[in-house]
Amino acid sequence: VIDNLHRFKIITIRETVKKHLKTTFNIKSQFKLHPFYEYDITKNTGKKAVAMSRIDFDKHTDIIINANNILIGDGKEDNIVDIYGAKNDLYVFHRLQNKLQLNLDDFYKGTFKKDFDDLNEVLSDAKFSIDLSAIHNDGGGSQYTFLEAIYQGAVLILNNKWVENKKSVFKDKYNCFVVKDENDLVKLLKKWPNVTKMRNNAKKLLEPHLDVEW
């Protein structure tokens, strides 16, 4: 695939990917913000913490499960993270079950349809949306799951490896929270802090995606 990319006009939705294509493969690309559609939503109750990305190696779901187990042990069952998303069975079996002895099923709420109604149902109760993605040669910018969470009033909790790029639009304790491991995540979820100002700051990230020409 890489050998043939020179024949096409390439568009990337994150600056890190654009840079990687150029420096690694000498492939030019154009960076464009991905557009966002303002679908109908219900008022956010802010009662839960959710994780909605794939359950996979680069998503670090094990950190979330470890944090949940600690929270339960400390009597904070109401603060655990509900986990949604498609499973990578290899990750679940080899990493979670065999290597780490972690039980995803204790917190797994299943998949949801990729439509606005189901998306709204999951996010309408979410005070926090946890996405611990850390992908080699990627990060710093946004993705659809981030924008959906911001749009519905859920504050993002992100992996520090995602935002370590100096050009990242995400700033810890300004428009998101940043954690490096389960201990950081536990501390944050135990506090269950007020996020009104942070939610408003995050909304500013959404605005450029509402008027994008492709």
Regions found by a protein language model. Give the residues of each.
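Conserved donor-binding/catalytic core segment of Leloir-type glycosyltransferases
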Residues: 40-69, 82
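Acidic donor-binding loop of glycosyltransferase active sites
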Residues: 121-139, 154
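Nucleotide-activated donor-binding/catalytic signature segment of Leloir-type glycosyltransferases, i.e.
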Residues: 93-120
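A short, active-site helix/loop in glycosyltransferases that binds the activated sugar's phosphate group
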Residues: 1-29
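Short beta-strand->alpha-helix junction loop in the catalytic core
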Residues: 16-17, 26, 30-42, 55, ...
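A charged, aromatic-enriched C-terminal amphipathic alpha-helix characteristic of glycosyltransferases
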Residues: 180, 189, 193-214
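Glycosyltransferase donor-sugar binding loop
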Residues: 77-96
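Nucleotide-sugar-dependent
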Residues: 131-147, 159-168
